[in-house]
Amino acid sequence: MTTRRDDDLDRAAIWQDFVLAAHLLEVALERQSQRDGNISHGHFKLLVLLSAAENQTLGLKALAGMLRFSPSRVSHTLNVLERQDLVTRGRVPTGRRAYEATLTSQGRLLVARVLRAQRAEIRDVLFGSLGAADAAALGRISARVVRVLDEAEV
């Protein structure tokens, strides 16, 4: 019979493994983004969101929400990316006092190059080590983690 203490120890070990896995994945993505794109992974995530958006454009408020960044952090990130000609920023055409960011052609090329390297060096290696059932479980668990953290507004 499993005791409460054993359950707590099991959960603590699982938690430590999960935190380490998340950290190592972020380290690998950061290293790869720097090497193949000369860009931080935090900045790269913003470019990826723009690349997937309609007309490769998103409002700054939407970007902040998706990335869980403060408005000032989004603004700072966009300043850096604008200087590198990876994005442009302008007013929303509807006349509101809102702003939006658009991925440039240079930004699209960078996203394609870095994603190609990520796929080969990180994603395919990770999924190659998992069977179909484990990959599906990882997908379900990842979606649940996102949902729980979103609901908790952590």
Report the location of each language-model feature.
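Residues in the helix-turn-helix
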Residues: 73
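N-terminal leader segment of winged-helix/HTH proteins
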Residues: 1-37, 86, 136
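N-terminal positioning helix adjacent to the helix-turn-helix/winged-helix DNA-binding module
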Residues: 14, 42-44, 59, 106, ...
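C-terminal regulatory/oligomerization modules of transcriptional regulators
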Residues: 1-9, 132-154
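N-terminal helix-turn-helix DNA-binding core of bacterial DNA-binding proteins
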Residues: 27-70, 154
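Alpha-helical linker/hinge and terminal dimerization helices associated
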Residues: 25, 29-32, 67, 110, ...
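Charged, amphipathic alpha-helical coiled-coil/dimerization segments
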Residues: 79-137
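Short, hydrophobic-biased segments on the C-terminal half of alpha helices
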Residues: 60, 78-79
